Amino acid sequence: AIMQLVAKKQISLDQDVSELVGFKVRNPKFPSTVITLKMLLSHRSSINDSEGYFSLDAIDPAKNPNWEKSYNAYEPNKGYMYCNLNYNLAGSILEKITGVRFDQYIQQQILDPLGLYGGYNVNALDSNLIAKIYEYNRDSAKFIYSPNAYAPRTEEINNYTMGRSTPIFSPTGGMKISAHDLATYMVMHSQLGKYK
């Protein structure tokens, strides 16, 4: 989705993330080093998930007094660490640039044109088509059904703030899609955005 915006020249991979999200995103150990969109997408931003990643507040100095813990000791673009918050930030940037909610943009601009069934909003999907998830319970030594994994997000969506509430859809990996349709998506991805 971000690369569609890059191709349309609506955004640059070298842009300062701070300008795109609306608050300062800087590793306090390297305050003069700009963190770019490219660094987010390649997990080289020096950001970590230690303060959480279900809210952008984790990294926002105005919202979290411990925001500095969200950064690693290495300079941005000098190391690699997988970080979910990177992609939640990217999803928020997508919303700010397009004015379209993350899940709806993915649906309209990627899934629907490819004829794929899936999405990031569990409220819009047929629950009968979603596999049930089980978690291992150590106390009972059994696997127990975990209904919260795909719980509706009705309240969160009703209170949604564009460019800020994006993590509820989990741009980090919250896509619900069949293996067949995911394979179709990956073919398109491997062919630089073209399918068939």
Predicted regions and their residues:
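Glycine-centered, phosphate/nucleic-acid-interacting loop/turn motifs that mediate DNA/RNA or nucleotide
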Residues: 9
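Short, surface-exposed loop or secondary-structure junction motifs
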Residues: 28-196
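Short, glycine/proline-biased beta-turn/loop segments that scaffold the active-site neighborhood
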Residues: 12-28, 113-114
